[in-house]
Amino acid sequence: LLMETNYRSTRSIVERADAFIQRNQERRPKHMRTDNPRGEPIRVVKLADYRNQASYLLQVARDCQRPTAVLYRNNDSALPLLDLLDREGVPYAYRQRESFFFTSPVVRGLTEILHFAFDDCNRESFLRFYYKLDLKLKKQLLTELLRFQREDETVFETLLGADGLEPWQIGRIKAMQTHFARLPQLTSFAALQRIVKYMGYGDYIREQKLDASKLDILLALANQTPETGPFLARLQALRAVTAEGGQEDCPFVLSTIHASKGLEYDRVLLIDVVDGVFPSLQEGEAQSPEDRAALEEERRLFYVGVTRARGRLELLTYGEKFGEPGEAGTSFVRQLLGEVAEPQERLTGPLPRSKPEAGPTAEQIAASEKDYLPGVEVVHKKFGRGLLRNRTGSIATIAFREVGVKKLDLTTCLRGGQIELAHFLPNRA
């Protein structure tokens, strides 16, 4: 049995990481140890929705004063945050690899459809994407009919003015005409949702087995630029931003886990730690040898990300995506933290008498307040669980599940031990 020493991370990180990687079968029998202090426990930040993740990280970047890394499995995961950082003028370093997001089939197809919604006379564009939608007309027929398109005539006007179409074909053309007439009136987010859910593009993604994660990134970017015209222009600008790489010497770093190997940071935030993203595969008895090997590789990658942290490690997860329930579970979080995020002492006898503990110091309260950012879930002793919607100074606006929206003074609540961040607790069968 090999023993290796980790000189970088705290004991709480090393011990958890070592237990986590032991789940892999195809590895040398070795353990990691450290002589470093235990340090603070690993934190889980459970956001209410995926779309809150970029704004949460934006605030972290604004407050950043020491080496901090946002690490992710997929290169495209940084784009929503990169968009906000660039807009707000917040400095960052971006250890990018070549991104194929902007030229991927999903993104190219959806953006071309949006462009066509503003120029529905463009026959060439229409013939490039029509088969991806719920039109079900043959190319030969469409090409023949559109040969007679007049200069001032839309594609749909030409098709509906042709002779010899069957009633069902006319019905599909009219339905698509209605969809395209509506798209320019919608927000960019709603327009993308309409194309995917109601115009057949989602079926095309599934049938062609395209990378659906590109759609989530595109929706997140659309959510940050509501108007469709400016959204399409922003995509072009963001493509140029990704090539620049930010400021090389900035302490706030965005990086894939692969690119972070051999590096270390005072604080590490691992993002998108939800089943279906990281890990992208699930464990199970029916798992093929190929899937099992791929899952072990994802676990090794997660281990690398965890052990980039010298002192503070945070795992970002979320319960919903754009208001819809996401994947049920965060298996890597449970495995890393031993099924429960923070060990809780169970008392079985009478409570022992003890001297009253001193309350937190002003410095401790100030440090804790930095974690209470819009989008995080909190638990109040009196009001229960809620979502922190907004914050001005120490005044937080929180929407509680049971009692509605309230404004609270965070400093007072933290000093009295009345509020805390919602702990991650796994679902139990």
What are these regions (language model features)?
Residues 1-3:
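A short helix-turn-beta junction within AAA+ P-loop NTPase domains corresponding to the substrate/partner-engaging
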Residues 5-91, 118, 184, 366-369:
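Helicase P-loop NTPase motor core
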Residues 102-106, 408, 417-418:
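Short, charged, surface-exposed secondary-structure boundary motifs
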